[in-house]
Amino acid sequence: MTPTQLKDQSPFGATHYDIEQGKPVYYKINNLGYTMRFDGKMWYICHGAMIQNYRTL
């Protein structure tokens, strides 16, 4: 996928992404400072994840 395709397909609020098993996984920081992960349906809190380790959109 190109960066433009990744950005176009990203959910609202996503700021970072990673490729896992050939599919993009999106991340964001919520208003309390927790890293949130999007699995295609919902945002989940991702404990121990460092947002700096993921690529920016």
Predicted features along the sequence, with ranges:
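Structural boundary micro-motifs
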Residues: 1-57
